[in-house]
Amino acid sequence: MTNTIYIHQPEKAVSFTRLPNFLFEAPTFTPLSNEAKVLYAFILRRTDLSRKNGWADEYGRIYLYYPINEVVERLHCGRQKAVNTLRELQYAGLVEIQKQGCGKPNRIYPKSYEAVPNTDFKKSGYGTPED
């Protein structure tokens, strides 16, 4: 007999990360690499923790720290790939990266899909992150 674990066993449940549908359906975001889409999902997950811990700047914007070495670990990639993936999210308008200098990690400000120009999900009929 095999040791099969079925999904209905709540004590064996695992944590998961939500991956927003709009990243795959909205024309604005379909060109993003899959790594960038997954990293954005990890950033959104970490945003919840930042919100709970009260990490907001003087304007009330939630920020987080995601050092490059952690991105490398999470995505199982090299340093340059991690940098490029973060940059890809920045160019897509999904995050703002603020350098702090003096050896401090960059602050990452996650943005909502609604903040990205040329993205009108109501007109396009594509889903929202809650779908």
What are the residue ranges of the model-derived segments?
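Charged low-complexity intrinsically disordered patches
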Residues: 2-3, 112-131
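Generic structural motif
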Residues: 22, 100, 113-115
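Positively charged, structured surface patches that bind polyanionic biopolymers
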Residues: 1-37, 53-62, 73-74
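Winged helix-turn-helix DNA-binding recognition segment
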Residues: 29, 34, 47-110
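Generic N-terminal initiation segments characterized by hydrophobic and/or small/turn-forming residues
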Residues: 16, 83-86, 118
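Short amphipathic alpha-helical elements of helix-turn-helix/winged-helix folds
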Residues: 42-46
